[in-house]
């Protein structure tokens, strides 16, 4: 990962996607992205590289990394277009194979030129995740209706976090839902989270996510808690 257009180009993305395809025994790969402006271009390039190499693509659209990781286990592989909590101009590829992140040997395969099979062109499918329903069953219903404020930070947790919390019985308010209007940066651990701090003074708890939804900061009684 790195600054898009400088450290990471579309040529790099195409190369890495094609090379990754040789590791996919299932011939199926889940794709998801966070909300970075460069995400759409990179996603389409990843799809092209995989499908050209005979891999069927299962597109989750914008989704948090934990959701995409779980779906990747079902299909055998996944590529998540994100640079996590890094600055907006950054982007990257998180790759999942057989339910795990890539190891050193697999990374070497991805970086170095490969000759993937071109026996057929892969197909593209739009998919949705059962993550919210499954997680809600595990958590169960919360009886006392806690008041929760969720600071999306303009990221991929937008729909997933609020829907899950509401499903288990929380009274949910969301702030910074839209990427273009977010009052803070992509990393909640380094931000003051002033809007969330103010908002949670009369609520039970606040949660702040990073752009790909795998990093969380908690605010209680108007005070940011160190992770």
Show which residues each predicted segment covers.
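Gly/Ser/Thr-rich active-site loops/lids in small-molecule metabolic enzymes
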Residues: 174, 224-227
């Amino acid at each position: 990962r790195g600054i898009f257009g400088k450290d990471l180009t579309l040529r790099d993305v195409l190369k890495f996607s094609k090379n990754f395809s040789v590791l996919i025994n299932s011939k199926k790969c889940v794709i998801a992205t966070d909300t970075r402006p460069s995400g759409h271009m990179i996603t389409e390039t990843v799809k092209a590289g995989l499908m050209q190499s005979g891999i069927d693509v299962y597109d989750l659209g914008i989704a948090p990394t934990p959701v995409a990781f779980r779906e990747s286990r079902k299909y055998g592989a996944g590529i998540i277009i994100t640079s996590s909590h890094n600055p907006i101009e950054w982007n990257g590829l998180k790759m999942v194979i057989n339910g795990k992140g890539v190891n050193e040997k697999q990374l070497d395969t991805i970086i170095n030129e490969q000759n993937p099979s071109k026996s057929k062109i892969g197909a593209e499918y739009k998919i949705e995740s059962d993550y919210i329903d499954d997680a809600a069953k595990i958590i169960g219903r919360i009886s006392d209706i806690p008041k929760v404020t969720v600071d999306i930070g303009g990221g991929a947790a937008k729909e997933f976090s609020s829907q899950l919390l509401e499903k288990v019985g929380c009274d949910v308010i969301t702030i910074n839902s839209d990427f273009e209007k977010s009052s803070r940066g992509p990393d909640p651990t380094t931000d003051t989270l002033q809007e969330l701090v103010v908002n949670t003074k009369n609520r039970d708890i606040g949660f702040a996510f990073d752009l790909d939804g795998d990093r969380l900061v908690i605010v209680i009684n108007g005070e940011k808690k160190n992770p």
